[in-house]
UniProtKB/Swiss-Prot annotation:
The gene is RTL5. Residues 115-151, 323-506 are annotated as: Disordered. Residues 372-392, 401-415 have a biased composition (Basic and acidic residues). RTL5 is one of at least 11 genes called Mar or Mart related to long terminal repeat retrotransposons. They do not correspond to functional retrotransposons, but rather to neofunctionalized retrotransposons genes. Residues 117-146 have a biased composition (Pro residues). This is Retrotransposon Gag-like protein 5. It comes from the Eukaryota. Residues 476-485 have a biased composition (Polar residues). PANTHER family: LDOC1 RELATED, RETROTRANSPOSON GAG-LIKE PROTEIN 5. Residues 353-367 have a biased composition (Basic residues).
Length: 569
């Protein structure tokens, strides 16, 4: 019994061991199946590579150099037909037949077994990759540029009033088309093509071959401003600087034109800044709202240059298909193209269709609202421009009125001064009346309205020329009696002729005051000169002229003044 139970236990143990071996074999079988699948996949890939390399490549023959040979290459006989020599021919190779699948599987199994060969099967060598052709030293030909349209700019003939606006327009055009003007010579030639007359002759003579201005565009602009610098009348410069607007021109050209015209004006810095801001474009004016107050015009121009530099920095390009976050209903280009095309699917339920139509209506409303806002902004801009134009016209009218008032005030002051001088003359006459008024010659009589009235100074000079023909009267101050020889004593002449009075002297210089305290001043022979009356402004004008009267003092009366000769009073 004990032997039977021992055998049974041993059989059971053997059965368990066999089952374990069976399970191990099943696992190995599964692993082999996986390896077989991978091997078949590699076989398929290798089959594709083999089929692509069926045509064997021609072997590379080494290049023979003449210095490495004992004889010249020219002594070699030329082989007809372009065939290679026998030594240079590649060994004959048979065309490979199609490899069977069983052979490939056996090769892979031998490779996977540890006793099999370790070397992989020989495969055809792929040809070396074709080297790219060497890059040529010459630059690639550039596509031809489109012909440049000539701008509609009035030619410059040399008038300095139009120089600022002319240069501003041309500098902006050249800056916008820099591709067509790569060098300074092209820019100088293009600028000269808009000159006419004397300006063109001067520019051609200055920019000849070998001249430093031939290819130096900035220096040529400076020479133009020096040559045609003016002068410009202040009134003309004021009108030109008010008409100067930046528009689409660059800031640098606008600033140069403004400073060129400002040098002919006597405005203060605050007024220049206000006028500079009026001519700026709307973009710069909006940006300057956030900046502080500028000290002078130069600081304002530098601030505008800094704003322009920030704007010219390239901005990142938005990714396509990304919806605007700020305005989620803003139109996208893809939606605008397919706006009219609507597709309805049968599977789309009613709620989804309703949501899609609602979003589409919202987009349309947003577009209409944005369009209305743009139209309102344009209308406001037009109104602001009209208001600015009206204000400028009113300012010009006010300035003209002020100038007229100032001129009228100056005229009134001159008239009042003339009247006051006439009254002073009458007072200085001491109330003495002339013995008789001379009759006016009909030839010299002038009527108001028939002949144009001469200026006051010219009329006075003419009257003085007429009076120069009258003989001067000499008085002896030491005698109080009148006589035919009282004015002709030797001590009064001293062998000298009377002085000649220039006609350009004013009447105030020839005025004779009352000689009080001197003997003989109230004598019967002394009388006031005659009055000369003429027609003038407002029908009558009274002009008083006196002949020059010279007095001589004796040494007893004159003292130290008698040594000087005649004393003119």
């Amino acid at each position: 019994m004990s032997e039977a139970s021992g055998n049974l236990n041993s059989l059971r143990m053997a059965n368990v061991a066999l089952r374990e071996e069976l399970n191990a074999l099943r696992g190995e079988n599964a692993n082999l199946g996986l390896q077989l699948g991978r091997a078949l996949a590699e076989v398929n890939s290798l089959r594709g590579n083999v089929s692509s390399y069926i045509r064997w490549p021609v072997p590379i023959v080494p290049v023979l150099a003449e210095e490495n040979l004992e004889f010249a290459l020219s002594e070699i006989e030329v082989i007809p037909g372009g065939e290679l020599p026998f030594l240079c021919r590649p060994p004959p190779r048979a065309e490979p037949d199609c490899i069977s699948d069983d052979l490939l599987i056996n090769v892979i199994q031998d490779r996977s077994t540890p006793d099999g060969p370790a070397d992989p099967p020989l495969l055809p060598i792929p040809p070396p990759p074709a080297l790219p052709p060497p890059a040529s030293k010459e630059p690639p030909p550039q596509p031809p540029l489109a012909p440049l349209e000539r701008p509609e700019i009035e030619p410059f003939s040399g008038d300095p009033v139009y120089l600022a606006e002319f240069l501003m327009q041309l500098e902006t055009f050249i800056a916008d088309h820099e591709v067509h003007f790569p060098g300074g010579a092209e820019r100088v030639a293009f600028l000269i093509s808009f000159f006419t007359g004397e300006a063109k002759d001067w520019a051609i003579s200055v920019t000849q071959e070998g001249s430093p201005l031939h290819a130096n565009f900035p220096r040529f602009l400076d020479e133009i401003r020096k040559e045609f610098c003016g002068p410009i009348p202040p009134r003309v410069a004021k009108k030109a600087i008010r008409k100067l607007k930046q528009g689409h021109c660059t800031l640098g050209s606008y600033a140069d034109a403004f400073q060129f015209l400002a040098q002919f004006l006597s405005w203060d810095d605050c007024r220049l800044q206000n006028q500079f801001l009026k001519g700026l474009s709307e973009f710069f004016r909006k940006e300057l709202l956030w900046s502080t107050e500028m000290a002078d015009l130069d600081e304002l121009i530098l601030e505008c240059v800094e704003i322009e530099r920030k704007v010219r920095v390239p901005k990142p390009i938005p990714l396509p298909g990304v919806r605007n976050i700020i305005f989620p209903f803003a139109p996208s280009p893809n939606e605008e193209e397919s706006e009219d095309e609507e597709y309805y699917s049968e599977d789309e339920d009613q709620e989804a269709r309703r949501h899609r139509l609602h979003s589409k209506d919202q987009r349309k409303r947003m577009r209409a609202f944005q369009q209305e806002m743009k139209e309102k902004e344009e209308e406001e801009m037009k109104k602001e421009e009209e208001m600015k134009k009206k204000e400028e016209k009113e300012e010009e009218e006010e300035e003209e009125m002020k100038q007229k008032e100032e001129e009228e005030e100056i005229r009134n002051k001159n008239e009042e001064e003339g009247e006051s001088k006439d009254e002073e003359d009458e007072d200085e006459d001491g109330g003495q009346k002339p013995e008789g008024e001379p009759q006016q010659d009909p030839g010299t009589e002038e009527t108001y309205g028939e002949v144009e009235e001469e200026p006051l100074d010219e009329a006075q000079d003419d009257d003085l020329d007429e009076l120069m023909e009258m003989e001067p009267t000499f008085v002896h101050a030491s005698s109080q009696t009148s006589g035919p020889t009282s004015g002709y004593h030797a001590e009064n002449f001293l062998g000298a002729s009377p002085p000649i009075i220039q006609p350009s002297r004013r009447r105030n210089q020839n005025r004779v005051p009352l000689l009080e305290g001197l003997p003989g001043t109230n004598s019967p022979f002394y009388s006031s000169p005659q009055l000369i009356r003429r027609t003038g402004r407002l029908g009558q004008r009274q002009v008083r002229r006196r002949p020059p009267v010279l007095f001589r003092l004796t040494p007893r009366q004159g003292g130290h003044r008698a040594a000087r000769g005649r004393i003119r009073v």
